[in-house]
Structures are given as structure tokens and as C-alpha cells.
Amino acid sequence: MILASQSPRRRQLLEEAGFALKICPADIDEAARPDERPTDLVRRLASEKAEACRQMLSQGPADGLLVAADTIVWSPELGVLGKPTDPDDARRTLAALSGRTHHVSTGVSALLLSPTCEVLGSASFVETTDVTFYELTEAEIDAYVTTGDPMDKAGSYGIQTPAGRLLVKSIHGDYDNVVGLPIPRLMRELSRLTRHSNGILWPLQTLSTAK
């Protein structure tokens, strides 16, 4: 599989699911369009990343699969919360999220490619998970920011890290989606796209034989 992303978290999730990956980072303009809804934004960016990567390829992947994704943290009240520009920005974001529920949406675009990189099929979807934070004190926010954990993450936190998980009171939806890629949904979409005879069991068989 070709992954059109440099995210170490997406790479880890896919490798844990049994995929051998080739990384193809896609450089696109990620600015939102006027009045574009958050879910429409991530769907569009994922599709543009997939196409940008496809255009750079001279040969299709062995399994024919190319996957691109884009994840945002947002709420109707706060808008889209990107990666912090500095520690103070991270503090402001975490204070705004304190005691509230926000959304994490990931747009995914999957292409089935021929050996000459022609598109044989495609799948596009958006997965959204609701995340609720505990009420955070200023001292708790400062302690978390001091770890450096927020600085490369949308929304200024990482649910998968030992420190970041302590901020989260509850989630409703797919945990992997908050990390960066909704693996269970992706597996089902890939099964439909590739029409493997074993359906959703095919990646699980790969995992069982790898142990």
C-alpha cells in the first residue's frame, strides 16, 4: 500500500493492521474555502492528497492500493483547531477545550490503481468521533504543554500518548480515528473496493500469519 501521508501515527496504525507501506507525502494547499464545512474540508483534502500522490507515481503499488487522509479537530463554537504555533497557543486551545465536547473528523480517500497508475476504483468517506475533556486546571495545562506533546498535533493534544490520554474524560466513536485513521471503517471500505474473496477477514488473516 502507498500512504500519502508522513504522519507517524497513521503509518503505525496501518502497519499494525498488517500492511507493508511505501510513503508518498503529498504537498497541497490545505487552506479551507469560504464557508466550507469541516467535514467537507477533510474529505476534499484527502481526495486532493490522493490525486497529488498518484500524479507523482510512475508505477502502481503491488496491491493496487493508495490511501490518503486528513484529520481536523473542531467544534461549532471554536471552529477548526490546527496545530499550535507556540506553547502559548497550545495553552489557549487546551483551555478552550477544557470541560467541553469537540469533534475529530478524518477524511479518507482510497484509490485502487492499475500497474500504470490508472484509477480502477475509489472510496471516499469521513469518520467523526466526539471527544469530551475533563475540566483542566491551569497547572494541568501547563504541565501538559511542558511535555512538548501538543506541539505537532491538531487540537494541541494526542489521545494516544501517556500524558494526552489523561485529558480525556470520554469518547464516542472510533478511538483510532482520533489517533489519525479510522482503521475499522477503512478495512471495510477497502474490502468493498478490492472485492477480496475473504471480505473483511483478509487483513486479519495477514495478521495471524505474521505472528
Predicted feature locations:
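A local structural micro-motif
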Residues: 21-22, 198
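Anionic-ligand binding patches
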Residues: 2, 15, 35-211
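A short beta-strand-loop structural module common to alpha/beta enzyme folds
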Residues: 22-30
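Flexible, glycine-rich phosphate/dinucleotide-binding loops
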Residues: 10, 30-32, 117
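Cofactor-binding loop segments of dinucleotide-utilizing enzymes, especially the Rossmann-like FAD-
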Residues: 6, 26, 113
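N-terminal beta1-alpha1 ligand-phosphate binding loop
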Residues: 1-19
